Amino acid sequence: MNLLFAWRYFKAKKSANAINIIAWVTVTVIAVATACQVLVLSVFNGFEDLVKSLYSSFYTDIKITPSKGKTFTLTPDQLQSIKQQAGIYAVSMVIEEKALLQNADAQTIVILKGVDSNYVHVSGVPAKIITGEFNLGNADDPTIVVGSGVQEAIAVNADSRSGSPQSILTVVLPKRGGGISDPTEALSEGNTKASGVFAIQQDFDSKYDITNIDFIKQQMGLGPDEYSASEIKLTRTADLLAVQQELSKLLGAGYIVQTKYEQNTSLYKTMRLEKWFIYAVLTLILAIATFNMVSSLTMLVLEKQKDIAVLQSMGAFLSFKISPGK
């Protein structure tokens, strides 16, 4: 019987008073707001995953840096202890320093990373080579991989198949213990050949270059166990926070152990804030539309009190409902 009454009112001629118009507009707003919320958050999640994948190509799962100064000492025994920790896949030792990079008359300031042979196992940079190859040479015959932004800035040729000779770049680095009275003693110069170009994201491509760690140590006068950082890749099943805590306990207070999210905190915080802001705005729109719907239904019930009274006098139960617009 309920369905028969509902079908009769459904087929009846619709009224076009203000209450019904407001009700249908509200329904439309709720539907559109919900669809927009799902669509925008889906797009934002996809964009967030893309940004994370790009930054993960450069930032490793865990990075160890000194709590004071630019370098720290890590003995072979300490390094072996790190490698033996559960969940660690590979460890690469790194020297980072600002350097002047010259190609003939062109020059630019870069952050030069000296890395060891394990770097290919911890970083995604080797997979982002667009010209040449990821080859860093050795201390006596070093080669360098430059970012695409640096390549454009100083016109670096790193392609051995181009028919033109690969660029020989001059690297100027600060030297430990250089005389302050004589500026020339505070700097060291070395030549290296361009072997490849990587492209990840503009922030990295225009700032970072990568070369052999022994070459940088030789130029800067660093000891065999001195490093700027240790970059670590974990196994797929490893617990990132658990490994971070274990390494912090192992190394002590003289070292900072950061996850890939902590290495670029501002980026991830900004992305989270943007996501929650979008969610809050769309939820507010949805809440306002919902309140409008409740108000419209309340006015609709008041408008149809006569119809409800007639149905009740005919023996209808209170559970009978009359749909909007009848």
Regions found by a protein language model. Name each.
Residues Q84-D209, D214-M220:
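A structural signal for hydrophobic secondary-structure junctions
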Residues A16-W24, R236-F291, L300-L302, L311, ...:
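Peri-transmembrane interface segments
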Residues A33, A289-S295:
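Amphipathic alpha-helical repeat scaffolds
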